[in-house]
Amino acid sequence: MSIQHFRVALIPFFAAFCLPVFAHPETLVKVKDAEDQLGARVGYIELDLNSGKILESFRPEERFPMMSTFKVLLCGAVLSRVDAGQEQLGRRIHYSQNDLVEYSPVTEKHLTDGMTVRELCSAAITMSDNTAANLLLTTIGGPKELTAFLHNMGDHVTRLDSWEPELNEAIPNDERDTTMPAAMATTLRKLLTGELLTLASRQQLIDWMEADKVAGPLLRSALPAGWFIADKSGAGERGSRGIIAALGPDGKPSRIVVIYTTGSQATMDERNRQIAEIGASLIKHW
């Protein structure tokens, strides 16, 4: 099914954390194996997209660095402002060389003409462009305002305190710029299926995530033909890696999956491989 024909239905939000955890032992064994292989903590949660029921979880209420996965939440906040008539996706933002930070593959090419809010969200999610994220953060009032937006959604766990690239420092036992797998999964589900955003904005957000171009080595590498995925990855210091995704067979998403890891000395390739293997186990035991 083409994404143009897929529309996320309005689904009432249920308190997922009041429900028991039904784990598929094989996938959780793989998650624990990934911890051993990486020498790191791994957090994992899988939610049913329609009901919000927790299907699997491992360390669901431990804090992990958000890294670039926050960019989906950021663009959700931007879209909320668009829906409220406080922002326009077509508004062009101009910036200078001084605004550029490391890893800005899209924004560095548009110093002369600037970029629209829509283009900045696309760059932030599909290419993980850091300057795009900072420019968008400025439009909503900075990291604290994103945290306030999340609090208003009912997420009192997830917090953004810093700008790119400092938010990726992943300092142990530092709650700044962190989330928990359970909180992130619930918040992502609200953004994609709840009434916080209009149908058009929900569709726009999932379109950007579906067009992600930098998450290929992770869950996408384990995806069978015909499956749908819309995702956003993140990478940080101290061996941190993460991904948030909506995925499912038959060309449409049916589950939310969140995976975070931190504290590893493994290479990026090895971190990617372990997450991909978790994805392969998830799909095998779907």
Swiss-Prot record:
| Record field: catalytic activity | a beta-lactam + H2O = a substituted beta-amino acid
GO biological process terms held by the UniProt record: beta-lactam antibiotic catabolic process; response to antibiotic
EC number(s) given by UniProt = 3.5.2.6
Q: Disulfide pairs?
A: 75-121
Signal peptide start and end residues: 1-23
- Calcium recorded as keyword: no
Which InterPro entries does this one have?
Beta-lactam/transpept-like, Beta-lactam_cat, Beta-lactam_class-A, Beta-lactam_class-A_AS
An example of a GO molecular function for this protein is:
beta-lactamase activity
Residues noted as binding substrate in the record, renumbered to the chain:
232-234
Q: Which Pfam families match?
A: Beta-lactamase2 (PF13354)
Q: Which residues of this protein are catalytic?
A: 68 (acyl-ester intermediate), 166 (proton acceptor)
**Which keywords label this protein?**
Antibiotic resistance, Disulfide bond, Hydrolase, Plasmid, Signal
Q: Does the keyword Translocase apply?
A: no
For the protein in the UniProt heading, the enzyme class is hydrolase
What the record says about family reads: Belongs to the class-A beta-lactamase family.
Question: Additional comments on file?
Answer: The class A beta-lactamase family has a specific amino-acid numbering system, sometimes called Ambler or ABL numbering and often misspelt as Amber. A multiple sequence alignment was used to derive a consensus sequence and then the consensus was numbered taking into account insertions and deletions. This allows use of identical numbers, e.g. for active site residues, despite differences in protein length. UniProt always uses natural numbering of residues, hence there appear to be differences in numbering between this entry and some papers.
Q: Which PANTHER family match?
A: BETA-LACTAMASE, BETA-LACTAMASE-TYPE TRANSPEPTIDASE FOLD CONTAINING PROTEIN
Q: Main role?
A: TEM-type are the most prevalent beta-lactamases in enterobacteria; they hydrolyze the beta-lactam bond in susceptible beta-lactam antibiotics, thus conferring resistance to penicillins and cephalosporins such as ceftazidime.
Tell me what this protein is called: Beta-lactamase TEM-12
Q: Which organism is it from?
A: Klebsiella oxytoca
